[in-house]
Amino acid sequence: MSFTVQVKEELLLQSSQNKSELSAIIKLSGSLGLASSGLTLSISTENAKIARHIYELLLHFYQIKAEIRHHQKPNLKKNRVYAVLIEDGVNEILNDLHLADSFFGLETGISPLVLENDSWSQAYLRGAFLAAGSVKDPEKGKYQLEIASVYSDHANDLANLMQKFLLDAKVIERSKGTITYLQRAEDIMDFLLVIGAEETKTEFENVKLLREARNDLNRATNAEAANIAKTVNASMKTINNIIKIMDTIGLDQLSGDLQEIAQLRIQHPDYSIQQLADSLTVPITKSGVNHRLRKINKIADELTD
């Protein structure tokens, strides 16, 4: 089950019923038709449970028993499309939900009444997500939550609605419509709380924390590997210089303290500076070890091949 389906299934388990939720679903998934009896309304979804939810909302608010039909998407074996069909009382529904425009169509923006009321705003966002929302699995890639709109003014109104709850919503035009989206994990979690998906919000947060812990561990591992590589490279340079001294003038020409550090470095090429410092007959500081190694490198540089 995808994370999007998880969120939607949690929302469908809630007993809350609000006309603003139905309004959003119709706005984003509804289409008007004309029959001999007048206007018809068809609300489409690929989720059978959402189709049943729409049916129940219509029955609850308008005592209308809609018809649920389904058909297979062309060239797709699994995806069924469910259509909730209303043939009676469509004008009354549209007027009651403030969806009708003056040209027997659907208003493309969001009613100011929704924007002014917090509970209506939350219900509208819930309906919008049920109808046309998706959220990327937090385990995979970048975080993203989207709601697709046919009309750009609706997408912008949706962004304003999200911003009302302090969410950093943005809008982008795509070939098939306009997308209102959130990209910050914190905004996505807050959105899930706003629409009432508390369990999936908690799951999202747990996955996010696990991802961050993994990333921190990887960064620490990479940093440690880089430090080891740096130590080994510096060690090999010094070892090559010690070998050069041995082949030309011999280590016995060095002072006792330089001889000791040279022999330690040859014996333990993987030792860090601190490990070298601790292994000396008389332990010294890291800066003291670095000073001796620099002297060895300088002596080697001054020798002619």
UniProtKB/Swiss-Prot annotation:
Pfam families: HTH_WhiA, LAGLIDADG_WhiA, WhiA_N
Secretion signal span: none
Protein name, as recorded: Probable cell division protein WhiA
Record keyword Cell division present: yes
InterPro entries (UniProt xref): Homing_endonucl (IPR027434), Sporu_reg_WhiA_N_dom (IPR018478), Sporulation_regulator_WhiA (IPR003802), Sporulation_regulator_WhiA_C (IPR023054), WhiA_LAGLIDADG_dom (IPR039518)
DNA-binding region(s), residue ranges: 272-305
One Gene Ontology molecular-function label: DNA binding
Gene3D superfamilies registered for this protein in UniProt: Homing endonucleases
Function: Involved in cell division and chromosome segregation.
Any Gene Ontology biological process: cell division
Keywords: Cell cycle, Cell division, DNA-binding
UniProt family annotation: Belongs to the WhiA family.
